[in-house]
Amino acid sequence: MTMWSSSSEAAWAALWARYDVVLQSHKKSDLATLDAWYLATFPPILRVREPEPYVTQQELQHLMEWKLKKGKWRPQLMKFVSGLSESEVKQASLNAFKELKRGDLRAATEALCVLKGVGPATASAVLAAYDENVPFMADEALEAIAGIIGPRKYTLPHFLSFAEQLRAKAKWLNEQRAANDDEKAGDTESWTAQRVQLCLYVEAHDGAATGSVSSKKKAPSPAAKRKRDKPTTPTPAKKKEEKLQEESAKDQDQSLRRSQRKRQRPAA
């Protein structure tokens, strides 16, 4: 069963708790630092710029570096973003955040996609940094719900379907938490579409590690070894066969002894 079909909010919370561990397991140079910047440092910077938040050209480059490091490396995208001017990045992001505040995710995404090298996936990363109700269009999350929205595509319609599904899942998880009163456990953060996306990232990479181990030939466990070395208990049929063999051998032995005694008697 996949996490997406799980009916347990606690299972999702347990997966979320493993995010840092799984991220560190990749051992990609600077990934943890870049991820910390994207998730913890960058969002407050955007909010400080209210009421008209924007992204600088350098921040967009940094975000692209994070995106490519965490996913598939495509140097051409970095080249395009590096060639953008400060003014065009600022204006596009101003327009995007303005549309997002109005609740128009499509228009917000389109406003960023006018920039060369920025498609729906990169645009989603920019928007998610400002509003966690927008999920980053990560490959792992796309694959997790491919059975619902179709095979992975980096198009605007596909992103909108993706965002709708993850927002609905976040809403359901918050309802489950409220019903179970799980906030007493200490984690009082609400579920967001972005947090759901991060959980699916954990599932994909944690599961990949488990799968790679199970695909290798494992050494037998101590219990299995004891079971293997333990003498097997004969079946009833086997017992009967062994008894017949034993009786046959006994009869042959008695017959041989009678024959020997007969040869040893003195002649009349």
Question: Each predicted region: which residue ranges?
Answer:
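Alpha-helical interaction elements in eukaryotic regulators
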Residues: 55-59, 89-92, 104-108, 118, ...
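Helix-hairpin-helix/helix-loop-helix acidic hairpins
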Residues: 73-118
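Short alpha-helix boundary/capping elements
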Residues: 67-72, 130-134, 204-205
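C-terminal accessory module of base-excision DNA glycosylases/AP lyases that mediates lesion recognition
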Residues: 1-44, 134-268
